[in-house]
């Protein structure tokens, strides 16, 4: 797993040596960015393939010291919230390999982060005081239709994350949705009535 760090995160980590991305599959790459939203430090953790976004606040100093472990535990917790089993989560992390901090994963990924930061400025509610995981903000950001790097079509990040899990074989493929056509009676304007 690669955890991309923007300049703001690199400064907070107090590191000068960050590796280039080694070309891991984007579904195993998460880019991170630290910014202020409504007067609080918010860490965005954004999947490079599907733009699924996790918003965290009040990062404790020890979490910065063990950054890769912290990010993995956050992703693990959010996947649990989404309904994935321990076996499925374990499979994801096993497939992702060793965790390293790298530079971000391209212009499109950074553009996605910038979009999330801009959208977060318009979030109409206050951030939860006692919660580190800002669930409502994350849900708000994951309802923004987009076409991220890992997909040819537009979609919502939360749906695209599920599709990535299906592509990896971690989640079972859902049946295609049935389309119901609404039948209306012919109208004289249709020219079908004589």
Protein language model features and the residues they cover:
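Short N-terminal edge-element motif at the start of the domain
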Residues: 4-38, 45
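Single conserved hydrophobic/aromatic residue that forms the stacking wall/gate
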Residues: 183-194
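Globin-like tetrapyrrole-binding proteins
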Residues: 1-20, 86-182
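A short, conserved beta-strand element enriched in hydrophobic/aromatic residues
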Residues: 29-66
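Short coil/turn linker and secondary-structure boundary residues
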Residues: 59-62, 84, 186
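Short, solvent-exposed cationic patches
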Residues: 67-90
């Amino acid at each position: 797993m690669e955890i991309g760090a923007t300049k703001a995160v690199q400064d907070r980590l107090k590191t000068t040596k960050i590796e280039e991305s080694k070309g891991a599959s984007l579904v195993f790459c998460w880019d991170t960015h630290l910014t202020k939203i409504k007067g609080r430090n918010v860490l965005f953790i954004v999947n490079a393939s599907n733009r699924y976004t996790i918003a965290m606040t009040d990062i404790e100093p020890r979490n910065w010291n063990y950054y890769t472990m912290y990010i993995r535990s956050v992703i693990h917790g959010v996947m649990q919230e989404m309904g994935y089993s321990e076996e499925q989560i374990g499979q994801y992390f096993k497939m992702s390999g060793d965790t390293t901090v790298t530079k971000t994963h391209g212009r499109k990924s950074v553009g996605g982060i910038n979009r999330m930061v801009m959208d977060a400025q318009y979030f109409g509610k206050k951030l939860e005081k006692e919660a580190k995981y800002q669930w409502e903000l994350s849900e708000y950001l994951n309802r923004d239709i987009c076409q991220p790097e890992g997909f040819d079509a537009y979609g919502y990040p939360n749906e695209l994350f599920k599709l990535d899990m299906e592509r990896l074989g971690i989640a079972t493929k859902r049946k295609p949705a049935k389309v119901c056509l609404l039948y209306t009676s012919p109208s004289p304007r249709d020219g079908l009535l004589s």
